[in-house]
Swiss-Prot record:
GO terms for molecular function: beta-tubulin binding; gamma-tubulin binding; kinesin binding; protein kinase binding; small GTPase binding. It comes from Mus musculus. Its main location: cytoplasm. GO terms for cellular component: ciliary basal body; cytoplasm; cytoplasmic vesicle; Golgi stack; nucleus; trans-Golgi network. GO terms for biological process: cilium organization; embryonic heart tube left/right pattern formation; positive regulation of kinase activity; regulation of cell projection organization. Expressed in tissues rich in ciliated cells, such as lung, kidney, vas deferens and testis. Both isoforms 1 and 2 are expressed in testis. Keywords: Cilium biogenesis/degradation, Cytoplasm, Cytoplasmic vesicle, Golgi apparatus, Nucleus. PANTHER family: PROTEIN PITCHFORK. It is found in: Cytoplasm; Cytoplasmic vesicle. Interacts with proteins involved in ciliary transport, including ARL13B, CETN1, KIF3A, RAB6A, RAB8A, TUBB1 and TUBG1. Interacts with AURKA. The keyword Nucleus applies. It comes from the Eukaryota. During primary cilia disassembly, involved in cilia disassembly. Required specifically to control cilia retraction as well as the liberation and duplication of the basal body/centrosome. May act by stimulating AURKA activity at the basal body in a cell cycle-dependent manner. This is Ciliary microtubule-associated protein 3.
Length: 207
């Protein structure tokens, strides 16, 4: 906060005027905006070393700086030897956005070559739009019978069938031996089962 001298009355010859001190509220005695570093730099060695954001005043558009800051932090960080495979500390991987060549980019009128709105699609009459064949490959070979191979009037070879009940033989309708407490199998039991099988087989041909 600065102060300045203000005379109370006009000075007279040979008389020293009375002075009154008045307080000035302006910093550094000026009302102008302060010039800070990011946009302004002092005309010293430090200001010439660290240039402001506006760049060098003596270089025009398209001109390179005559002097390079070889000892600067930005230059040293850009020249740090790093690994491109990502094995070491501070390694660099591939470029995130690769430069696109102008020869590869599409030209005007390249898009929408085919107008899909004007196309008329044929309606499908297949259920659920399924037109795939039932069998992927046609069965053509000697192992597959051809037309006329089957004869529906031909009778198959007769086989012995037992009366079934829930997928198993119903032994209540088949002649069986009487149950005994002894689980040992006798020779008479074998003869009985053998005779029962023979009777069932001959009943196919003889009534």
């Amino acid at each position: 906060m600065n102060t300045e001298e203000i005379p109370v009355a006009p000075p007279l010859r040979g008389v020293t005027p009375a002075l009154q001190w008045k307080v000035n509220n302006y910093s550094f005695g000026t009302r102008q905006a302060r010039k800070l570093f990011p946009h302004y730099h002092p005309p010293t060695w430090l200001g010439n070393l660290y240039l402001p954001l506006r760049g060098m005043p003596h270089t025009g558009p398209g001109c390179y700086a005559a002097a390079t800051d070889w000892n600067g932090l930005a230059y040293n960080l850009s020249k740090v030897p790093t690994s491109t495979k990502g094995y070491a500390i501070g390694a660099r991987t591939a470029v995130r956005f690769k430069p696109i060549s102008k020869d590869v980019t599409p030209y005007p009128g390249m898009y929408q070559k085919v107008d899909t709105l004007s196309e008329k699609h044929k309606k499908s009459f297949a259920p659920f739009n399924i037109l795939m064949p039932r069998f992927r490959s046609a069965a053509k070979g000697d192992s597959y019978p051809g037309p006329g191979t089957y004869n529906p009037e031909m009778k198959s070879v007769p086989k012995v069938t037992w009366p079934m009940k829930f997928g198993s033989p119903d032994w209540s309708q088949v002649p069986c031996l009487e149950k005994r407490t002894l689980k040992a199998e006798l020779s008479a039991d074998k003869d009985f089962r053998k005779h029962r099988s023979r009777v069932a087989y001959f009943s196919l041909y003889y009534q």
